[in-house]
Amino acid sequence: MLKGKMLSALPELLKMDDGTPVTDRESWRARRGELLKTVIDMEYGGMPPEPKTLRVEELSLTPPGGINCYRIVADGYPFYLRIYKPSLPFRPPYPAVLYGDGCWKYMNDAFIAEVNRRGFALAVFDRLELASDVKDSGRSAGIYALYPEREFGALSAWAWGYLRAMDALEKISFIDASRVGITGHSRGGKTVLLAGAVDERFAFVNPNNSGAGGCGCYRFHTESDTPGGGGEMRSETLRDLLNNFDFWFGREMQKYADDEASLPFDQHMMKALMAPRVLLQTEALNDIWANSKGTYLTHEAAKAVYRLLGAENNIILRYREGNHRHDLNALSAFLDCMEGKTLADNTPEWVKSI
């Protein structure tokens, strides 16, 4: 049995910092600007700047059904992009799924085949080429060395990789850059939530099992009397995150490590920054660490912005049975969204009642 505790009310989403109500698209754009400044700077340490130079080098070109390889060089820093193209009868320009989790085991033949079978290109890079995922590895490597005066964390560095990969996709003629969706798992899911928030070119955003610092809720904690799929007995907290992965975040988050109730933001604000674009959150019911009820609470709160913009059907929360992984169930749901199918929330009543 799960039980939950709400530490404090979620901060106001549809009020400006000075208390002025947000009532229409114009005032939402102003509020969006406030949130980008407050949340991105505090939670993530800001973002790396847009590069002054960027070039895309073709390393290999193939016919339909093949793999094209590219080197992206941003301000002199290189990383690599592979594009798996669908076979005939699909013809370019292809919509594309952009996936920065080239470092995960989930990027396998079945994953590629499912994307291509539906007529999409799959563009893959390894976010670890941008910044290390090892605690205490320092800031002398990766893109930290490009911008030593900046204080962004690893999540921002990885999200920057998505932005630069999107720059590349816009230059590649067989990609339909107006129909690019991004997905990632766990810390990769946190990454795509950030990338989707700061860059409106991404038409579809899918964080999978992203938990605390992703689609969860800092203010809501869950405890269980039986272990979850990973043996966990409770949801992850900000203290847990900062003890193990402080380098993912901005330094200011340390102030709130044991006082999440006082955070001036929560993850409903990150979700709202996607509006009115499609945001599909995919979660696993036995993934207690990822805080399924917290995800539901911030989802429901973010709906207010989607409703204001006349796009309530574009924010979706889908649960599946199982544990912490990126499976074909979640991928298929995301491709359904990208094909324009309407998916409904499927939050179980027992999750709502925690």
Which ranges hold each PLM region?
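Short, solvent-exposed loop/turn and secondary-structure capping segments
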Residues: 81, 94, 108-112, 133-137, ...
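Mobile cap/lid helix-loop segments that gate and shape the active-site cleft of serine hydrolases
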Residues: 207-270, 291, 295-299, 307-312
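Alpha/beta-hydrolase-fold serine-hydrolase catalytic core, especially in secreted/extracellular enzymes
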Residues: 1-80, 85-92, 107, 200, ...
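Generic beta-strand/beta-sheet core signal
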Residues: 125, 183-185, 207-208, 282-284, ...
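Primarily recognizes the serine-hydrolase "nucleophile elbow" in alpha/beta-hydrolase
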Residues: 163-232, 259-260
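Loop/turn elements at helix/coil->beta-strand transitions in domains of secreted/extracellular proteins
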Residues: 92-97, 117-121, 176-179, 200-204, ...
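Cap/lid segment of the alpha/beta-hydrolase catalytic domain
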Residues: 99-171, 214-220
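Solvent-exposed loop/turn segments at secondary-structure junctions
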Residues: 102-106, 128-132, 187, 211-213, ...
